């Protein structure tokens, strides 16, 4: 992907405006999950090492544009950075008409979503952001699918617009998995509905050698194969779509499943053959035989793309399928990339974070990239790089 990279630029004495993803959960003024901040710190340190005058900003929550709201302030992020960095970090609320930045400090510009015109990519706001800097650095993959003033507009008007290390790594990893994957390539697509992942499935059917489906998506494929799914979550109207996909792509249907009588943490799990599901039962996980068969497919894969669990792994009784699949991915020698909220929760639960080749930081952006869509914030960086 031809974008200018921050790592290749001389930033000495330059005013650098970094758009990061610091949209972290906050409770009682304290950051409760610091993953996104920790991911951004190396970018900030690199900019400082290169002698830049560093500004960084992000969105946080959903404030009303034009109104400052303490609940959506980046102050907890500033407090976190001050506690974890050896350089002074200060928060500036009013910065659109200019801000003084010194070398050796980090200036955090208050939540971009407080600025009128941010979401609709108002060109005047984009120009104001651009006037603050010599170099704009887009480093928030999680918002790259949105054309907003701080992700797109500023990149149009800044003297130089480039990709930060996080964004560049994300694009490289996704490119490696989707553009020229080492084969065989296996995709794991879980989730409750075929309809929400239809474009993902269609796109992957043209790339992957095999697609493993899980969750409610798998139930629709089980029904398409002619089996009773009882009270399971599935989409009857999408059975023809599932049949077409199964006819053109290798999509293994589970041979056994775990069922329950109610959707609850305490529901008892019964393992049975896929053709023995009763009318009052719901499928909540794949069975051991299916999990082992799929683990074998994963073991032989050279590229693995993972988006979504294969069962209701939040409930201990219906966790085993996702656990077996997760460990198979972790133990595979192939290149693995994982993305999506539920997938990240499974990675944390099973303690396999260090064994996945690349974990994507973007939910919606990850899916849109997999669907083959152009991400606006990346598109504008490419345009700027190519004059």
From Swiss-Prot:
Alphabetical list of Gene3D superfamilies matching this protein: Phosphoglycerate kinase, N-terminal domain
Listed GO MF terms: ADP binding; ATP binding; phosphoglycerate kinase activity
Quaternary data: Monomer.
Pathway assignment: Carbohydrate degradation; glycolysis; pyruvate from D-glyceraldehyde 3-phosphate: step 2/5
Keyword list, A-Z: ATP-binding, Cytoplasm, Glycolysis, Kinase, Nucleotide-binding, Transferase
Protein name: Phosphoglycerate kinase
Localization, UniProt: Cytoplasm
Reaction catalysed by this enzyme: (2R)-3-phosphoglycerate + ATP = (2R)-3-phospho-glyceroyl phosphate + ADP
GO biological process: gluconeogenesis; glycolytic process
Entry similarity comment: Belongs to the phosphoglycerate kinase family.
Highest taxon, organism lineage: Bacteria
Signal peptide: none
Binding site for substrate: 21-23, 36, 59-62, 113, 146
A Pfam family matched in the record: PGK
Location (main, coarse): cytoplasm
Gene responsible for this protein: pgk
EC number(s) reported in the record: 2.7.2.3
Chain positions recorded as ATP binding sites: 197, 314, 340-343
Any single GO CC term annotated in Swiss-Prot or TrEMBL for this entry: cytosol
């Amino acid at each position: 992907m031809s974008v200018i990279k921050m790592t290749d630029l001389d930033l000495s004495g330059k005013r650098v405006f970094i758009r990061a993803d610091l949209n972290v959960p906050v409770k009682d003024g304290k950051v409760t999950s610091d993953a996104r901040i920790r991911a951004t710190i190396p970018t900030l340190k690199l900019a400082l090492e290169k002698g830049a005058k560093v500004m960084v900003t992000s969105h946080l929550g959903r404030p009303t544009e034009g109104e400052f709201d303490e609940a959506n302030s980046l102050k907890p992020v500033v407090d976190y950075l001050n506690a974890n960095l050896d350089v002074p970090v200060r928060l500036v609320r009013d910065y659109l008409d200019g801000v003084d930045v010194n070398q050796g400090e980090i200036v955090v510009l208050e939540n971009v979503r407080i600025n009128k015109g941010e979401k609709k990519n108002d060109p005047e706001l984009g120009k104001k952001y651009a006037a603050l800097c010599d170099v704009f650095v887009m480093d928030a993959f999680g918002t790259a699918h949105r054309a907003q003033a701080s992700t797109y507009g500023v990149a149009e008007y800044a003297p130089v617009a480039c990709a930060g290390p996080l964004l560049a790594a994300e694009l490289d990893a996704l490119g490696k998995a989707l553009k020229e994957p080492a084969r065989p390539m296996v995709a794991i697509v879980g989730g409750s509905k075929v309809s929400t992942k239809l474009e993902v499935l269609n796109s992957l059917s043209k790339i992957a050698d095999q697609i493993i489906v899980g969750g409610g998506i798998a139930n629709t494929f089980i029904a398409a194969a002619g089996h009773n799914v009882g009270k399971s979550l599935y989409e009857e109207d999408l059975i023809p779509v599932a049949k077409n996909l199964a006819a053109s792509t290798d999509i293994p249907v589970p041979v056994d499943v775990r069922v329950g009588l109610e959707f609850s943490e305490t529901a008892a799990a019964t393992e049975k053959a896929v053709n023995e599901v009763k009318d009052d039962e719901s499928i909540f996980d794949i069975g051991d035989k299916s999990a082992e068969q799929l683990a074998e497919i994963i073991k032989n894969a050279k590229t693995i793309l993972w988006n979504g669990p294969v069962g209701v792994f939040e409930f201990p009784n219906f966790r085993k399928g996702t656990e077996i699949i997760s460990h198979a991915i972790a133990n595979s020698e192939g290149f693995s990339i994982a993305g999506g909220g539920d997938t990240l929760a499974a990675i944390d639960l099973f303690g396999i974070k260090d064994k996945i080749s690349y974990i994507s930081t973007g939910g919606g952006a990850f899916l849109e990239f997999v669907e083959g869509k152009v991400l606006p914030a990346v598109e504008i960086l490419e345009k700027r790089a190519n004059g």
